[in-house]
Every structure is written in structure tokens, then in C-alpha cells.
Amino acid sequence: MDYAICPRTKLNGFRTTLNVSPWLVGSLTTMAVRKPTAIQKACIPEILKGRDCIGGSRTGSGKTIAFAVPILQKWAQDPFGIFAVVLTPTRELALQIYEQIKAISAPQSMKPLLITGGTDMRSQALALSQRPHVVIATPGRLADHINTSGEDTVCGLKRVRMVVLDEADRLLAPGPGSMLPDVETCLSALPPSSERQTLLFTATLTPEVRALKSMPRAENKPPVFVTEISTENNGAIPPTLKQTYLKVPMTHREAFLHVLLSTERNSTKPAIIFCNHTKTADLLERMLRRLSHRVTSLHSLLPQSERNSNLARFRASAARILVATDVASRGLDIPSVSLVINFDVPRNPDDYVHRVGRTARAGRHGEAVTLVGQRDVQLVLAIEERVERRMEEWSEEGVSIEGRVVRGGVLKEVGEAKREASGEIEEGRDVLGRKRNKLKKVR
């Protein structure tokens, strides 16, 4: 099909307002992406002009397309490898970006490459040495290749034209567990900032991100383009997101969760349950499975192949519930999610913002329910101050969660399921009851 003359393509806002190449417009149209979002309108023209960019916009606003489209348009004008590097904090987000770039670039012979932990280093090194056009990576694994895989493998990075730091606030955050040393290793293998185009995207413009605006620049480079469109710095929780809390006794939190998932309003909703710890997520998945919920999980104790498989099952609605740690709180776009439950109240209000951002995306409606114990009140108050909105007490007509918990043997049923799940973990069995070696955390 000739995209330049396709009537549907002519009507696409990316062509009429942003001067995006016809082949890209046709690809976006095929994906049912016809109207650019605010962050895309602001950033795409400036990136095409060659300007460095700091783009701030809340979750679900289309930041990936905002950098992927200009990268692919510039690459098509001068296709060589390695043209661009995209760094992002989690494997799941890297996979999602890889799949989006692969889909958008389908009409061309563009080769993206995914570089993340949990997979074979040697096969990755071979693929990296073959000069893919766009590398999408987590900083830790790409830094490993830079440090250990040899000059022949990583020399292509020295010609990179564009680099993206996606979820830049997380990548640049200092402190324990910081990714910043690995990010610096990655950037040191690329051309200097004066010879490349640097794009930063985030839902939260932190001081570390803002500071990059005023860094010294080469004389031949225009000023950094900075846009902040309804970011989550100013409490911009989508108006379509309903925030509620449910008071729970600490000793019966699991029973309240089971009943909450089973109410008439919630029993069919695709839901993500967030926990603060991997052990909690592992236990909850096993327990909920015994209580006949269609459930899977996503956390760092799982092998990468299982993480990918579980996420694919949830996307395909083979599982209705995803139990996850904050590894799933950033960037993942699963449009069907209409319910987010905070089983544990996050310690950091920013983590709350990213968690609830998994629902009510792109104008859709969603609900976030936070289970609140007596010790969680101060955390909830800090969250409300951060998002500049009060949570409402959860309610459903004709439903008393507490009443259902104390009646009908729910406490006994949930208690037995929890004990069986704990025993399974102690015996070293997987969620299907099969004996296997003790899971180890992998980078």
C-alpha cells in the first residue's frame, strides 16, 4: 500500500500537524494511532529539528511514541547501526518498548535489539556485534557488555546518534540501589553529548532531571527543549481515576483482599495487586490460586522467561489478576486494567503515583483501592498531600466487606489457603506445586 496516497493516512494527525513521514503515519494508522497526544505534539517537531529534549508527562500519555517516531524517521533518512540506544529501568518496560518500536517500524527493514538481564550474555553479545539499528536496554546488562564483552562487541555504540533515558527520574536517582553508575557506564561508551541527541522522558521531573537543562552545552547545539505537560509533579492524577481506601485489620488483610476481588463489581475486572516485597507477592499468588482466582505474578524472584510468560498471560486475559512488586509499576501499558489494589501501602508517595498509573490510562476510567491498616494512616496522608486529592472510603451498594469476611467461613478458607501456600514455598515448589531448585534473584 502506498501510504502517501492512502485516504486514512491523509487524515492522520501525525501527518497533518507534525509532518511525520508517510510510511510512519501509515504504520501508526494500522495500529489505530491517529491523533497525537499533547506530549507527542510538543516533542516530535522539536526532536526532528535535532534538539535535545526533556519531556515530562504523566503515565499513559504516549511518551514512547513521542521518542520512537522521530528516532525512526531520522534513522530512515540515514539508516545505519547502531543509530539509537534506549535505556529504561525494568526488563518488562524494555520489552514493551522493543515490541512497540518493532511494530511501528514494520514497513522497514529496521533491526531493534533487546538487551536485558536474565538471558544469555553470549547470544546478546553476538547480536550486539552485528550492529542492530536500535538497542533497547536496561542499564545493568548493557553496562555488563561494555565492561566484559570486548571492543568488537560494543564498538558500534561509538557512532550512536540518539540516546533516550526513559523513566529518567528512576535512572538518575541517587542513593542505595541507584542505577546511576550503570547509566554513566553506558553513556561513557557513546559519543559525547555534543555529538549526539539526548532525550529524557519521565512522569516525574525530579531535581536530578531538571538539573540537566542548565548543564554546559556545545556552541553548535540549540537549547534543550523542556516541556512539562500535566506531569505527576503537580499531583496530576487523571480525573478518570477513582481513588479509594479500605480499612483492614492487619491480621485479616488477605481475607479482605479475597472478598474485595470477589464482589459483584470487581469479580470480572482485570486487576493488578501491588505488594512492597517479593515474598508477599509470591505468597499472595499461591494463596489466591487456591481460592480459585485466575492469577499470575511479576517480581524479581522469578526467572526472566517466567516473568515474560506471566506478563503475556495477563495481557492476553488468560489471567485476570497480576500480583506484582514495583517492578510492574512503571511504564507498563496494559489498557484492559481497570482496578489497581495496593495490598501494601507504598512507603514513597511517588511509588503510589506510578502504581495507580497502571489504570485510567489514555482517558479510560479506573479505580485504585488501598488497603489501610492502623499503622498506615500517616503514609496515606503523605500520598494525599502528594497527589493533592483525598481518597474516598471504598463502598459498593449492598456490600459489606467486613460482614462477608466474618460470615460463611471466609476466614477459615483463606487461612487454610495461606497455610498451604506457605508450606509450598518452604518445600521449594513452584506455583503449580512442582519441585524445583530454590529461586535466586537474577540481575
From Swiss-Prot:
A motif (DEAD box) lies at residues 166-169. SUPFAM superfamilies: P-loop containing nucleoside triphosphate hydrolases (SSF52540). It is found in: Nucleus, Nucleolus. Residues 44-223 form the Helicase ATP-binding domain. Its EC number is 3.6.4.13. One of its GO terms (biological process) is rRNA processing. ATP binds at residues 57-64. Residues 240-402 form the Helicase C-terminal domain. It is an enzyme of class 3 (hydrolase). GO terms for cellular component: cytosol; nucleolus. SMART domains: DEXDc (SM00487), HELICc (SM00490). It catalyses: ATP + H2O = ADP + phosphate + H(+). ATP-binding RNA helicase involved in 40S ribosomal subunit biogenesis and is required for the normal formation of 18S rRNAs through pre-rRNA processing at A0, A1 and A2 sites. Required for vegetative growth. This is ATP-dependent RNA helicase dbp8. It comes from Aspergillus oryzae (strain ATCC 42149 / RIB 40).
